[in-house]
Amino acid sequence: IQVGDRAWLPSEAAGSTDKEKVHYLPGIWDDVFITVTGKIRVDKALFLPSLAKKQVTVKTLIRSLYPPQMLYGDNMKDICKFEFRIKEKTTGRIVSEKTIKGEPKRDNRTYFETTIPIDNPKAWTPDSPFLYEGEVSVYNQDKLVDRYSVNFGMRDFSRRGKFFTLNGEKFYLRGSNITLQRFFEDQDCQALAWDREWVKKLMIDLPKSINWNAMRICVGVVPDFWYDLCDEYGIVLQNEWFYWQNHGWDEQIRKEYTNWVWSDGNHPSIVIWDAINENWDNYIGNTLIPELKKLDPTRIWDAGYMTSTQMGTNDEMDEPHPYRAITLMHSSKLNDYFKKHPYNLGALHDNWTGFSYILDAGVPQLVNEYGWIWLWRDGRPSKLTLNNFNYYLGENATPEQCRELQAYWLELETEWLRSERSISGILAFCHLTNNYGFTGDWFINDIKDLEPSPAFHWFKHCFAPTAVFIDLTDYRYTKHLQPLTPGSDLAFNLVGVNDLNKVSSGKVILKLLDEKGNAISMQEEPIVIESFGKRLQPCLLKLPSKAGCYL
């Protein structure tokens, strides 16, 4: 199926343009199934869980293929029986059943809703992604005419003040972004997006190895089996529609978004519907989202850059993008700029011009983009970040030097954000995108091998659920600070953070290294970090009397 160029679509067609894509790629890119049923069939079904209430609300749209009433006295409806069954996915053990009767209208779709209790439900979490199978059987004149099944999980995702909660407990999101629609433009994409083992390594194995529990599906959805993998192995998702720049009439947008919720709404991994990327749309934010919230009340909605200022009580969360280094792209006089606006890389207490809103907001703040320091897979700076690398490394930096700077920079920015405990989640940009584009991902060489760049090594540490960071500006990457005096005292804080629901304690070993990597002093600092908390641990180092470079 080929639609043609993006510009040929009619004005009412819902969807947007992505200004970081080059081509419009229409056509079928997910599985298509042909099913054989009777004349009354399940068109759509949602199994919406409530772990707290130990029940599942099942919403169905039943499609009748019988012809409409043609003559006076002809049937307008048919009496049917609907059997609902819930089973454990792995064992097949039936945990609950219910039967209702209804009358689907002929040549139409009819809505039915029922609630099914579950005794002792097993919760779905990233650490224990337990799945159930929901089944709907349709009987017409006591004859089975359709059977429809989906997987789902028993989990409650909500918010409490500025924080997300999973199954009633505070939950911090840690992870990255997937821009699959951009990756489709990559000359090395080929059939990788439909290779289950490749996708599992990308979406499950690598993220879990570096302490990620979340991913944002960014500027366009992915094939259904990607969501299945996240359901099965435990990665939570912010699922974003194809919306950056506006396109489409309101009624068509309603149709597309409503179908989206029905289509993807059974996946327990999807905990946030992301309606817009970096934009504002009053119809979506204040009319459509409240309407769709009634269809699916089990998830949170994000409306791009819209906040409580535009949405009032409809605002459930915000998505700030603290790209602190963006100025390096726009300023032609970087040295003068940084004299007035120094960027103290490594100083975790450092403020940022856009940080005040994050601190003052009353809803969860999910930083789902940051890290304006992209490279292509061959180690060259991307289109947007050439000036970054030229400023810090010079114009002749090697790929290895660029990768090491990128990795270290991302570590320190991650530490900076995680140190602000009112931020409810941190998703770096970007885990997968098209090569040779405006941005970049953190793989090197051939993408089919998913060979990690040095950034992954640092991510493992800065994304650890319990971690300790050094709150100290790195003098190697600043031009506005004078060297410290040999033999002086250096006072700073260690910052301990804990995303877990239990107290974490241990000892921190602090070493001072010379330029050859030799330890010239060492001290131990005991530290205790409360659950979901932060601990500042003051430290004092006596600097060497010999001038030189130290770490």
Label the predicted regions.
Residues 199-202, 214-447:
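Substrate-binding/catalytic cleft of secreted carbohydrate-active enzymes
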